[in-house]
Every structure is written in C-alpha cells, then in structure tokens.
C-alpha cells in the first residue's frame, strides 16, 4: 500500500471521528515478498487467493503484536459475504442476489475464515468477529 492510498484517508477520517489512536502500517512490495514464505507456511495452502488476501492481515497483526500491548482485535471479517461484495450492483434480480448470498454464507467455512484465523492467532492475538456471530 502506498502512503497516498485512498484507504488511509478514510481510516484517518474514521479515527478522527472516533477520537481513536491511529497508526498507519505501510506495507510495500519488499515487505510482502520477504513475508511470503512465512505466510504460505502459516496458512498451509498454496491457494493464491487465500495467500494474497492473507499477507496484509498477517503483517498488520505482526506489527500489532510487536509494537503494542493490544491482544484482542475487532474485525470486519464476513461482512463482505453478508453484504454481497459488488454483486449487489450487478445481480440480475433480487431473487438471484438472495440465492447467491445464501450460497456464500453456507460455504463460508470452506474458504474465507482461514486467513483471519491463522493470521491473527499466529501472532498471539484474539479476534472478535461481530458479523460472524
């Protein structure tokens, strides 16, 4: 992520609104490449989508573990599946959107929770997943 990434702008706005302490963890190509073997070993999979999605979370969790005394995280995991990703914009009908949403929730355990589970726990952190409760 570059230092001018749009996500940083919005994260700062939210932190300012909540009067929260906010630290930006900038992750560049070199850091990602250096962590890649460790992330693959941690995940126990060669699935490229899982690996790609896990690297950032792993590195942020590692930073939190090494630089703070925080041990419990609140995550937004599962919210994309609940709210339909971008499919909400392109679904052919409300019925098909509902069917796809139900399918994603039924299959969630097969692919989407590995990233957070491993990336967080390997760094001695715990997660609270309100969208998954």
Question: What is each model feature region?
Answer:
Residues 1-132:
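ATP-dependent adenylate-handling active sites, centered on carboxylate activation for C-N bond formation
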């Amino acid at each position: 992520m570059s230092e001018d990434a749009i996500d940083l702008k919005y994260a700062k706005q939210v932190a300012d609104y909540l009067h929260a302490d906010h630290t930006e963890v900038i992750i560049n190509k070199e850091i990602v490449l250096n962590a890649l073997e460790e992330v693959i070993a941690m995940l126990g999979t060669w699935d490229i989508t899982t690996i790609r999605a896990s690297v950032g979370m792993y590195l942020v969790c590692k930073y939190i573990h090494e630089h703070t005394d925080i041990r419990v995280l609140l995550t937004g995991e599962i919210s994309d599946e609940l709210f339909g990703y971008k499919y909400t914009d392109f679904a052919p009908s409300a019925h098909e959107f509902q069917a796809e949403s139900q399918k994603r929730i039924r299959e969630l355990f097969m692919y989407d929770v590995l990233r957070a589970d491993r990336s967080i726990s390997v760094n001695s952190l715990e997660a609270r997943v309100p969208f998954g409760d």
